[in-house]
């Protein structure tokens, strides 16, 4: 589902009925054909108006706006959709940072991720409240790496690469807490000012 088809600017009080009807027709046809949909709620398609106003998930206002969006679609498609993904390839936020990325770029990327982690956890909570039958999960890009040799240094480097590019996002969403190696990653990139006040309140929620 494209967020901007439901809330074109992201901040409307009422959803776009034409957008809701479009997806209802799609899901109804799938049901008639015996196809069970797996729906991605966000696929790098934040409404442009929000990007221009608040930046790329760098403002906590996104959390409440995403909550409104998911509440709308969970209610609208109850009984038609059971399987949901909160964020598509969420780990690509950090996977595609260049090797020479600045500390500021890393700071923004990890702050961006945290707000999405909280929004994802809230979506799981809301989705289960609306329909206990909902199955809500996360989706990671398969950024798999392998050690160059069996040398312990190569093995450790590969482990740390997997931790940063893959397991960091997976652990938070599957286990509901930041993994122990998160502090190492933050230190390596001089990340010292993350706004993670909601972590205890929300990130324990999982599908």
Residue ranges and their predicted role:
Residues 1-43, 127:
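Aromatic-lined substrate-binding rim segments of carbohydrate-active enzymes
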Residues 31-206:
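Active-site region of glycoside hydrolase catalytic domains
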Residues 1-8, 112, 204-207:
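Short intrinsically disordered, low-complexity coil segments enriched in acidic
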